[in-house]
């Protein structure tokens, strides 16, 4: 459902003069009307011409095109964001296909690596371990009283780049930009946070420009006590906030999610968001290839928290489609660097134990090795779906893909590792090795593949198709928790918007130009499920839709009226 055009009410603000021009959430730059310039002491502080936001956006677009590298484009866009947020979002929404990879993956990875070098202006909250006893004061310093979404990281596992210390702040900033651009959540309601618990990245510790706490990372009880202090301070300041954990190391990600998901409205996008968008993609791809997801055999390369989170949601979805839990688990095979996860493998992590295969059931496999490699698994399982979350490039070899294709005429191959340099195989190779028959979705953006004079569009299995809609649905419904069923309703809704399913051709996921429409549909499904699950107050469908409309922010200037503080 398309958003209804809302008549914007005037905004009463107490700021004037240079202070107003330095306030990114309120600054209009050259779009201040003459009346506003008189009323807010801006006469002579701006050029004579009063511009529209579209005229400003056109100038910004011309300037943007003058930058030759992606990181320079990223820096330029961040500068606009820190100067005039409304213009930033108008520009991004006008050119979302071009700019999403610049404000988020893959370019944000380079921005995190160079965070201290390219730092210009503070955004968000930096909480160092040294300041742990000032947590309440730090959050009180945030000028926005009505924060509704926080994205927090500790910078330890940034994309596939590892420990970036305080540089990890680039991820919450970028993620929240997508909450607004794709999900219509007002930037005034968002807050990026980095927990600065030190870094084990020696290059950063030796860098004279590094702006974080120069100390090895705290661990164990010290770490968890620090995070708990943060959670309690957030609950005290904004008890109804949605808290998203982002890019925490595997050893901490699942424990933190399990510890706090029933204490504060929270989720982990790397685990749950990735799982939800992947399952939505698989539902659509399975329908396009013929049949249901429950009919497919699935092999994973990568058995960390993200891979196992996806696997568990797939199992839940196939149970919804009619499988028993035992049968659903027998169809999912997890491979890590030590081979196929089996019940005989030592040192399994807690979240891996339910995803093992019984070694006794593999006695008839065609292999001479005790360690069951990815090729062994593909040869014996004959999977319909191959998913890569290994973070290692090139592991989907030609031999493996061709072996898969021998037994599956329409293989679904999803190399999801980020950034592009870490992808398990390129779409170009996968299409060629399967004679143009594979359905491919990737974690990073790729251009369409041309093979034998045919164009193959490549869908990006981008969490931005999921988390903005979840956030909007939580805000609109007032949900106090995010349940697994809410996430699965988001996946099913995403699948319903697949052009490949709807039209028999095109991308397996919607085009970015439709992402706000998809986010609004996901918000409705998530809000409705929250009501059904008892974590949100029940309302009529019309009331829920109205709440979504009311909370959907658009990048338009409002008229200002002067008031005193």
UniProtKB/Swiss-Prot annotation:
In short, the EC number is 1.1.1.38
InterPro entries named among the record's database cross-references: Aminoacid_DH-like_N_sf, Malic_enzyme_CS, Malic_N_dom, Malic_N_dom_sf, Malic_NAD-bd, Malic_OxRdtase, NAD(P)-bd_dom_sf, NAD_malic_enz_proteobac
Q: Which cofactor does it need?
A: Mg(2+); Mn(2+)
Q: Which HAMAP family match?
A: NAD_malic_enz
Instruction: Please tell me the species this chain comes from.
Output: Escherichia coli (strain SMS-3-5 / SECEC)
Describe the family membership recorded for this protein in Swiss-Prot or TrEMBL.
Answer: Belongs to the malic enzymes family.
**Which of this chain's residues are annotated to bind a divalent metal cation?**
246-247, 270
Describe its partners and assembly state. Answer: Homotetramer.
Q: Which domain of life is it from?
A: Bacteria
Q: Which residues hold NAD(+)?
A: 157, 270, 418
Please provide one cellular component term from the Gene Ontology annotations of this protein: cytosol
Q: How is the cofactor bound?
A: Divalent metal cations. Prefers magnesium or manganese.
Q: Which UniProt keywords apply?
A: Metal-binding, NAD, Oxidoreductase
Query: What protein is this chain from?
Result: NAD-dependent malic enzyme
What lineage, starting at the top, does this entry show? Bacteria, Pseudomonadati, Pseudomonadota, Gammaproteobacteria, Enterobacterales
Gene Ontology molecular function, alphabetical: malate dehydrogenase (decarboxylating) (NAD+) activity; metal ion binding; NAD binding; oxaloacetate decarboxylase activity
One of the protein's GO biological processes? malate metabolic process
Q: Where is this site: Important for activity?
A: 270
Q: Name one Pfam family in it.
A: Malic_M
**Reactions this protein catalyses:** (S)-malate + NAD(+) = pyruvate + CO2 + NADH; oxaloacetate + H(+) = pyruvate + CO2
Question: What residues sit in the active site?
Answer: 104, 175
């Amino acid at each position: 459902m398309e958003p209804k055009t809302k008549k914007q009410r005037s905004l009463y603000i107490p700021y004037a003069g240079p202070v107003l021009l330095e306030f990114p959430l309120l600054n209009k730059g050259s779009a201040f009307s003459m009346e506003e310039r008189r009323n807010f002491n801006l006469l002579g502080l701006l050029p004579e011409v009063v511009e529209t936001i579209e005229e400003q956006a056109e100038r910004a677009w011309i300037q943007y095109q003058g930058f030759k590298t992606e990181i320079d484009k990223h820096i330029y866009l961040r500068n606009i964001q820190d100067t005039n947020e409304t213009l930033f979002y108008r520009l991004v929404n006008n050119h979302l296909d071009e700019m999403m990879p610049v404000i988020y993956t893959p370019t944000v990875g380079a921005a995190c690596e160079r965070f201290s070098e390219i730092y210009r202006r503070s955004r968000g909250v930096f909480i160092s371990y040294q300041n742990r006893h000032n947590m309440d004061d730090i959050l009180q310093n945030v000028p926005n009283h009505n924060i509704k979404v926080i994205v927090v990281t500790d910078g330890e596992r940034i994309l596939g780049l590892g420990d970036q210390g305080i540089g990890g702040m680039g991820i919450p900033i970028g993620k929240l930009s997508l909450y607004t651009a794709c999900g219509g959540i007002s930037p005034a309601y968002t807050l990026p946070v980095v927990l600065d618990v030190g870094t084990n990245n020696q290059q950063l510790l030796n860098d004279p420009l590094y702006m974080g706490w120069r100390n090895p990372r705290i661990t164990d009880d010290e770490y968890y006590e620090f995070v708990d202090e943060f959670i309690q301070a957030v609950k005290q300041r904004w008890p109804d906030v949605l808290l998203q954990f982002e890019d925490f190391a595997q050893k901490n990600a699942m424990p933190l999610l399990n510890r706090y998901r029933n204490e504060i409205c929270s989720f982990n996008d790397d685990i749950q968001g990735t799982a939800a968008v992947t399952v939505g993609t698989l539902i659509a791809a399975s329908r396009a290839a013929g049949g249901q997801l429950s009919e497919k055999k699935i092999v994973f390369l990568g058995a960390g928290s993200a891979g196992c989170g996806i696997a568990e949601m797939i199992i839940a979805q196939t149970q919804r489609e009619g499988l028993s839990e035992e049968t659903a688990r027998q169809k999912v095979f997890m491979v890590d660097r030590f081979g196929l996860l089996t019940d005989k493998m030592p040192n399994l992590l807690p979240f891996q134990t339910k995803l093992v295969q019984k070694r006794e059931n593999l006695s008839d496999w065609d292999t001479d090795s005790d360690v069951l490699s990815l090729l062994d698994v593909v040869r014996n399982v004959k999977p319909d779906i191959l998913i890569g979350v290994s973070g290692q490039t090139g592991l989907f070899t030609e031999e493996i893909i061709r072996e898969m294709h021998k037994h599956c005429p329409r293989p679904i191959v999803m190399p999801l590792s980020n950034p592009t340099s870490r992808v398990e195989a390129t779409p170009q190779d996968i299409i060629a090795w399967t004679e143009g028959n594979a359905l491919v979705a990737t974690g990073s953006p790729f251009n369409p593949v041309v093979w034998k004079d045919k164009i193959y569009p490549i869908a990006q299995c981008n969490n931005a198709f999921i988390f903005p809609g979840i956030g909007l649905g939580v805000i609109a419904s007032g949900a106090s928790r995010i349940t697994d069923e809410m996430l699965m309703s988001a996946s099913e809704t995403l699948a319903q918007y697949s052009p490949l399913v709807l039209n028999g051709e095109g991308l397996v996921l919607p085009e970015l130009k439709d992402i706000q429409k998809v986010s609004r549909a996901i918000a409705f499904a998530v809000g409705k499920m929250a009501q059904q699950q008892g974590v949100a107050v029940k309302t009529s469908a019309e009331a829920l839709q109205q709440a979504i409309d009311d909370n959907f922010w658009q990048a338009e200037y409002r008229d200002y009226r002067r008031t005193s503080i």
